[in-house]
Each structure stands twice: as C-alpha cells, then as structure tokens.
Amino acid sequence: MSHVRSAPAGKSGGGGGSTPAKRGRPFGSTTGSGAAAAAAAAAIGDAAAPAALVGPSLQVLTALSDQNNKRIVLALQSGLKSEILWALNALTVLSFKEKDDLRRDTTPLAKVPGLLDALLQVIDDWRDIAMPKDHTKPPRVRTLGVNTTLSGFGHENVEKVYSDTTTPSDDQTKTADSTVTKKRSAGFLFDEEGLFNVDDEGRTEKQQCAVAASNIIRNFSFMPENETVMVQHRHCLETVFQCLEDQNTEDDELITNMLETLVNLAPVLDLRIFSSSKPSFIKITEKRAVQAIMGMLASSIRVWHCAAAELIGRLIINPDNEPFLLPAIPQIYKRLVDLLSVPAVDAQAAAISALYNVAEVNMDFRLKLASERWAVDRLLKVVKTPHPVPEVCRKASMIVESLVSEPQNRMHLLVHENTFAEILTSEGKYSDTFARILYELTARPSNKVTAGQAIWGNIN
C-alpha cells in the first residue's frame, strides 16, 4: 500500500531523522519530504517578507483569516495548477495538527464559506482520472477547469494544434445539425476519452491533487469543531462513501484518507442523512453506505479492514444506525471473528472493540457468537495471550460475560467451564470477571439441572 502523502507537490528537502506518525497527524508529515514541511519552513524563514513580493506558489498562510478564505476557495475552483497547488499546500499546513495539540488558531469549516465544497469538487472530478479506463462504465463528467484553455497540468498544447479553430456560420450549423452522421472534431481524439490522449503526466498530477484534498478533509475531521459541519454535509458523506465503493479503481492513499475521515466522524454520524431532504449529489443510500463499509471490512489490506471494524463499532452504538447494520450482522460477525486469528495485534484490537460494541447492543449477535464454539475459543485465546494493550484482553473477557447473561447461551458456554476456571486461577486481572461468569453458569435457577456436574459441586 502506498505511503500517504500530505501534499501533492514537493521534493525531499532534508535528511533529518524522522519520528513515527501519530494518529491525529497526517501520515508522512514527519518525514521531511512533504510539501507541508517545506512550506512551513518557508513560512518561518521568510516571515518578515512582504506578501506582495511572493507569488501564490510561495506565499504560505499562517491562519484562515477573512482576507485569505475567499482566495483559497477561488484558487481551488480555478482549475489552474499553480493556484490549486498553492491552495492545497496552504490548507495542508493550516489543517495540520499534532496529537493532543489544542489549536487555538483553528478556524472551523463553517466559517469558511465554500471551502468544503471546493475540496469535494477536486476529489469528485479527479479522484480516478489517472486510473485505467473501465469501458463498461459511462464516461465521467468532469467540470473542474473545463473552461480553462491552459491549466498547467501535463502537456496541453498538443491538442490545441489539432483542434478545429474555425467558427461555423449559421447556415453551416443548420446543415450540420440536419446531417445524420456528424464529423467529430479532431480535438476529440486528444480529450480524456480520446484515442490519442497519452497525457499521463497531467492525469497523475490531477489525481495527486485529489489525494491531497482528501488528506486535508481527513485532517479537518480530527478537529471537534468541524464534526457537526461535516456529518451534516450530505455531499461530503456521499463523496466519502463513493470513494469507498470504488476502492478497486481509486488511489490507495485516497481511500485511506476517506476511511479515516469516516472513523473520526462515526461517533456523531447518522446514516439517516441519506434519506433526508438535504440536497443529494451522488444518490448514496443507507444500504449502499453499509455495503461500502462491508467491502472495506472484507479487504485484505490490514489498515482498511482494521479501520472498517473500528468504524462499525462506532456506528452501531447510535440506535438510529442499528437498523441499517442489522442485515449485515451475519457477515460482520464472521469477519470480526476471523480477524481474531490474525497475528497482527492491531487487527485483534479493532475486532475486539467492534465485537464488544455490537454484542452490547444486539442480542442476536450474542446468541450467534455463543453458539459457535470456535468463536468463543478465539475470544478466550485473546484473554489468555498477553497483549500490548491490556484493554483488549479486558474487553474480550467482558464480551464473554455479556454472552453468559443470555439464558439461551449457558448450555453452549458450559463446554468452556474448565477454561473459565483456568483463567480464574491464573489470570489475576480478570479473576472477578470470570468468577461472575462461573457464578452465572452454575448458580442460576435455570441451571439447576446441570449444577451437579459443575466443578464447584452441587450448590442447590
């Protein structure tokens, strides 16, 4: 999977040591090779330079002030390479946030009219422009920069030479309209769907702009003041879910940014927005959104299925989202239990966190989980195996305790009674939990028939 870049432009400019990327910090922002780092260095070195002496590609903003807001939005909407790169680099710096860093100078998206829409247009139009064509799909309509003669992306001059430059008269126009077969303009051969368009460089540059825009949206999603704006912005959520839907034809970096954006917004996200009266741009429904999440959960890429598991765990705690996730519970159950056997500790942690939340709110899930002996065995293995994050083992034991609380599950769980007793005597941290589990199994009135077989003796 490709390394996530924090800006579309910029070369390696330093050989200093790097620190590990943190959650809450853009991936690649600590390597010294991103444009954000270079731009920040330029801002520090030329802080006293007058703004009039530097062009749009050099001027670095230190805050989203009123005089800069409109200029950034217009730059994103221009379709010009120099303007878009300047705006994206500036926003990357402004949206950058260290872990646990309280940004007192942050400006909520709500106070920058049109900024979120401008970023979404860059993503919508250019997110897959450099990917191989799939001729089973209709051509994409791209409007960003369509009226710009020369934008600076790639090699644009070739098609201008071959395009028809003569303006037809009214009579010629009428004749052409009445003709059944029309002769296409030579410029068609060089446009995006044309036969001789080999401007891969321009396509790649545009797609990297979309990746950088997705990174900025991801950064903004870490700021609590932006949560409300983003979860109530239907176009934003539709774009994010459509990117997840098209994971096979998208840039890996862009998918990762969109998925992390959803994970950050999940605690306050209500899927009912897709059936609300808010204007829709892509026609995403609740069912399609859940299917997109399931596609990420089934992915073989570890970062994606871990994030998808975490996303499901956060979404289902909202009672309004539960009806949309219920049809996918069987697939969710199977995939989460499968992740428990993955050697990677982060995959186990994500699966346990999701299992814990789903088991807490859904009784059918608890019944299904307890009825599968191999699934309970994997949970107990997580409890018995030391984990770098003790909270994971604690949640695994609490999942087992929630299973015992269902009377229908006790007969299934009696099979594991010896293992429960072993953990009780050997794992001091979880002895209280497993003491309660054994008590539930052997001392409840519904279990008087099996109490004589319990290892604690007949306690009737």
Curated annotation (Swiss-Prot):
InterPro entries noted in UniProt: ARM-like, ARM-type_fold, BAF250/Osa, BAF250_C
Segments for region (Disordered): 1-32
ARM repeats: 225-267, 321-360, 364-405
Effect of gene knockout: Embryonic lethality when homozygous due to defects in endosperm and embryo.
Subcellular location: Nucleus
Keyword presence, DNA damage: no
Keywords: Developmental protein, Growth regulation, Nucleus, Repeat
Record carries keyword Nucleus: yes
Tissue-specificity statement: Expressed at low levels in coleoptiles, leaf tongues, mature leaves and nodes during the vegetative phase. Highly expressed in reproductive tissues such as young panicles, early developing seeds, embryos and endosperms.
Quaternary structure and interacting proteins, as annotated: Interacts with CHR719, SWI3A and SWI3C.
Function: Plays critical roles in both embryo and endosperm development. Required for free nuclei division and cellularization in early endosperm development, by preventing premature cell death in the endosperm. Involved in the regulation of pattern formation and organ differentiation during embryogenesis, by regulating genes involved in the early stages of seed development.
Protein name, per record: Armadillo repeat-containing protein LFR
UniProt organism field: Oryza sativa subsp. japonica
Biological classification of the source: Eukaryota, Viridiplantae, Streptophyta, Embryophyta, Tracheophyta
